[in-house]
Structure formats: C-alpha cells, structure tokens
C-alpha cells in the first residue's frame, strides 16, 4: 500500500503539479510532505498527517516552513486502546 501511495504522489508531482503552477503556501510542498510523512510514519499515520496539512492549506493560513514531526506519540487518535 505504501509503495502505491508513493507512486501516485510521484505521478502527481511529475505530471499534474507542473500544470497547476507553483502555488503552495508551505515548504516543503504538500506532496513532498505527504511522501516524507508516509515514509517516516507509515501509511495510516502518514495519511493522517497529510490530511491535517492539506486542511491547513487555505487562505487564512500564512503557510511557511512546516516539517513532518519526528514523533506523533502525543496524538490522541493513535494512542487510544481498542
């Protein structure tokens, strides 16, 4: 699953993103952030971090540098016992 997601992200970066232009308000870009988050934290946690990042990408956010956190152990979502 991880390889498929990374392949889709690479496809987006090389074929779709150039058509949209450089309009990302964050560094690294959201697609690069997604690749790093999925590689660092695995598929589920990486997708969760990517979702949170994309939600922040809106006109009321200044953007800027937003790196993938090294640890997300403080997240309530992933600490719940099922």
From Swiss-Prot:
One of its GO terms (cellular component) is plasma membrane. Belongs to the UPF0161 family. The keyword Transcription regulation does not apply. It is found in: Cell inner membrane. Its main location: membrane. Keywords: Cell inner membrane, Cell membrane, Membrane. This is Putative membrane protein insertion efficiency factor. It is a peripheral membrane protein. PANTHER family: MEMBRANE PROTEIN INSERTION EFFICIENCY FACTOR-RELATED (PTHR33383:SF1). It comes from the Bacteria. It comes from Rickettsia felis (strain ATCC VR-1525 / URRWXCal2).
């Amino acid at each position: 699953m991880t390889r498929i997601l990374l392949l889709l992200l690479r496809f987006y970066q090389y074929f779709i993103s150039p058509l949209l232009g450089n309009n990302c308000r964050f560094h690294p870009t959201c697609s690069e952030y997604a690749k790093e988050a999925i590689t660092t934290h695995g598929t589920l946690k990486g997708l969760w971090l990517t979702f949170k990042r994309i939600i922040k990408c809106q006109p009321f956010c200044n953007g800027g540098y937003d790196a993938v956190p090294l640890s997300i152990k403080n997240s309530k979502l992933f600490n719940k016992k099922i």
